[in-house]
Amino acid sequence: MEKLEMLYEGKAKQIYATDKADEVVIYYKDDATAFNGEKKGQITDKGVMNNKITSILFEQLEKQGIKTHFIKKLNDREQLCKKVEIVPLEVIVRNVAAGSMAKRLGLEEGTKLKTTVFEFSYKDDELGDPLINSYHAVAIGAATFEEIDTILEMTAKINNILKEAFAKENINLIDFKIEFGKCADGTIVLADEISPDTCRFWDATTGEKLDKDRFRRDLGNVEDAYIEILKRISK
């Protein structure tokens, strides 16, 4: 496998072409952003930790029947993945009220929800990734109803697998966001990453936040939170 030119650079990752048309290399950066890019900074070795965390979690999900774009971890910062067309939706899963949902609905952070909440945001930086529903998504051509059904079914399974896995490490999975992609044959697969950048992790005993909220809210010890998550899931 030969790494070629950069195809795309996002807030946290770079994507490179390879000598295989259907494979890409994803490089994880240390750059950190919050509030739709309004707050910017760096977290030491964040890219290394997120690459390792995502690789471990995607491998676990694959073993439990979830199709992903992940092929293998190449080194500390890079992984080899299937080339996919990203569905322009972020799927947000909320098990406990926190963050923007708590603020939007006037709920105290940490309030247990009577059911898991699934939300969509439309991936558009200029618009600030607005919340939309499935009808909006179909109306603007982001996905079909059939694709949305597949995505929601996969997301529910992913949530159950991750909640159980993290509970074993004394971590509550409060909420998270994931993305999906379409392979050349139209197959929907889990893409992007699962890491402290994209999840809220609270220690089940102390309630300590072990995720990017430490950067977002200036709580300090940001790197330590990422290290702790990697340490617990690496057992």
Swiss-Prot record:
Its EC number is 6.3.2.6. GO terms for biological process: 'de novo' IMP biosynthetic process; cobalamin biosynthetic process. GO terms for molecular function: ATP binding; phosphoribosylaminoimidazolesuccinocarboxamide synthase activity. It catalyses: 5-amino-1-(5-phospho-D-ribosyl)imidazole-4-carboxylate + L-aspartate + ATP = (2S)-2-[5-amino-1-(5-phospho-beta-D-ribosyl)imidazole-4-carboxamido]succinate + ADP + phosphate + 2 H(+). The keyword ATP-binding applies. The keyword Ligase applies. Keywords: ATP-binding, Ligase, Nucleotide-binding, Purine biosynthesis. It comes from the Bacteria. Pathway: Purine metabolism; IMP biosynthesis via de novo pathway; 5-amino-1-(5-phospho-D-ribosyl)imidazole-4-carboxamide from 5-amino-1-(5-phospho-D-ribosyl)imidazole-4-carboxylate: step 1/2. InterPro entries: SAICAR_synt/ADE2_N, SAICAR_synt_PurC, SAICAR_synth, SAICAR_synthetase, SAICAR_synthetase_CS. Pfam families: SAICAR_synt (PF01259). HAMAP family: SAICAR_synth. Belongs to the SAICAR synthetase family. This is Phosphoribosylaminoimidazole-succinocarboxamide synthase. It comes from Clostridium botulinum (strain Alaska E43 / Type E3).
